[in-house]
Regions:
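DNA-contacting surface of Y-family translesion DNA polymerases
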Residues: 14, 75-76, 191, 195-335, ...
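Flexible hinge/switch segments at interdomain interfaces of large molecular machines
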Residues: 106-108, 170, 239-243
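Hydrophobic alpha-helical positions that pack around
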Residues: 125-173, 178, 303, 314-328, ...
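Hydrophobic (often cysteine-bearing) scaffold residues that line and stabilize catalytic clefts
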Residues: 86-89, 125-129, 221, 257, ...
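Short, conserved phosphate-binding/catalytic loop or strand-edge motifs used
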Residues: 109-114, 152-155, 189, 208, ...
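Residues that scaffold, gate, or flank divalent-cation-dependent active/transport sites
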Residues: 1-113, 118-120, 127-128, 132-135, ...
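Amphipathic, charged-and-aliphatic alpha-helical interface segments
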Residues: 58-60, 172-207
Length: 441
């Protein structure tokens, strides 16, 4: 194939949790040497969906009917499928993977995707990052395979069908040629149709004329092939929006005390303040993520009524939030990583205060921020002018955090409309009852 060099700037890690369903159950019970499987209804029959190592060693495989599996292995322990619990677990694992990069997405039902482009050097390189990832995932009790490539399709294929490993940038075509067509993430029906005419591996279709291939088997085959080879872009959809600013701190020894957490918050806020000041911005919403040593992640958000940069103000916000959490933070065996992220930032240019300035509203802002953090954002409200001549619609009550941001915009819009329409001023007095107008014939 002439155009076989990937132009992707991604560096994708595909983490495949092959036995996610059985591993989840094994973590919740005492060690049991008997073979285990998860079964679910597919059509009119119960089908084997997942197997542990002992069941695979007995010759069982996915796709067998439950009756066949029991005939082959009478001692098989079978669990019912629980897709919602498995999906929550996969999301929790993906959430934990954000310790490596904010660009983390799901490869459901049993995979996680990470884009480590630009951040692998923080862990000593790609190999060191993958070693740390695999060590931690296995310590949590999950069997995992990992593939690293310049595209989502190639990383997915090498993790699940190519025994894992790294694909150097631009070498996707060379590594994928020997893999089965199912590695392209095409439907089983399409794979079967291709197999009937003798196409079983990716290398069998790479150099075929594209128009006849698309006409007979659909454009999806070519699309997935081009995506795997990096000839067509495929963005990774992150689990959470990527914060414009964030700072993090790993801990050689896990921390658990609240005073240590607050000290870390202030230290990270200083680093964020420097970033924000360079761009003339301040934070409006900030999130604290605490990564526990056992894989659980605690996230706490706080908001402000105006853009701020002062580290002590950020610390004060979280003092109130930590004191009023409905579900207090359980540190477990401690947190080994803390990350402070600015999720919403606004312009906050520096200004010089002179003796002629009007009263500063900083104290009012502090009051709004702290009471909102303690009582809840919806419990502290403010009236905001609206562009309406109906008195009962002339103002609305909004949470103070959003209201103070919209206050100037609301008044400005109202004044501009009145000026453009050349409307008279509102009357100082409204009659309780409208007078009747007499009609003269």
């Amino acid at each position: 194939m002439t155009a076989s060099v990937s132009t992707s700037r991604q560096r994708i890690v595909s983490l495949w949790l092959k036995r996610l369903q059985t591993d989840r159950r094994a973590r919740l019970q005492a060690p049991d040497p008997r073979p285990h499987a998860v079964a679910g209804r597919r059509g009119n029959a119960e089908e084997i969906l997942a197997l542990d190592a002992a069941a695979e060693n007995m010759g069982l495989r996915r796709g067998l009917s439950l009756a066949q599996a029991r005939a082959m292995c009478p001692a098989l322990v079978v669990f019912e499928e629980d897709t919602s619990t498995d999906a929550r677990l996969l999301k929790d694992i993906a959430d934990w993977c954000q310790r490596y990069t904010p660009l983390v997405g799901l490869d459901a039902p049993d995979g996680v995707l990470l884009d480590i482009a630009g951040c692998a050097h923080l862990f000593g390189g790609e190999a060191a990052l993958i070693d740390d990832l695999m060590r931690r995932v296995r310590a949590f009790g999950f069997m995992a395979h990992v593939g690293v490539a310049g595209t989502i399709g190639a990383a997915h294929a090498v993790a699940r069908y190519g025994q894992g490993g790294f694909i150097a940038p631009g070498c996707e075509c060379e590594r994928l040629l020997s893999l089965p067509l199912s590695a392209l993430r095409i439907t089983d029906g399409t794979v079967a149709s291709l197999s009937r005419v003798g196409f079983k591996r990716i290398g069998d279709i790479v150099d075929l004329p594209r128009a006849p291939l698309a006409a007979r088997f659909g454009t999806g085959v070519l699309r997935q092939l081009d995506r795997a080879l990096g000839l067509e872009g495929e963005p990774l959809t992150p689990l959470l929006p990527v914060a414009p600013y964030f700072a993090e701190q790993p801990f050689p020894e896990p921390i658990a005390r609240e005073e240590d957490i607050l000290a870390v918050i202030e230290r990270l806020a200083r680093r964020l303040a420097a970033m924000l000041e360079r761009r003339g911005e301040g934070l409006r919403r900030v999130e604290l993520a605490l990564f526990r040593t056992d894989g659980k992640v605690h996230r706490i958000e706080a908001g402000t009524s105006r853009p701020i940069r002062n580290p002590s103000d950020v610390r004060a916000l979280f003092v109130e939030r930590l004191a009023t959490l409905a579900d207090p933070i359980d540190p477990g065996f401690g947190f080994d990583l803390a990350r402070l992220s600015v999720t919403v930032a606004e312009a906050a240019p520096a200004r010089q205060v002179t003796l002629g300035d009007e009263a500063d509203d900083t104290d009012l802002g502090h009051l709004v921020d702290r009471t909102s953090a303690r009582l809840g954002a919806r419990r502290v409200t403010q009236l905001i002018a609206q562009d309406s001549h109906t008195p009962e619609l002339a103002a609305v009550s909004l949470p103070a955090h959003s209201a103070r941001a919209d206050e100037e915009r609301g008044w400005d819009a109202f004044r501009r409309h009145r000026a453009a329409a050349d409307l008279p001023a509102r009357p100082l007095r409204l009659l309780a009852r409208l007078p009747l107008a007499a009609r003269v014939a």
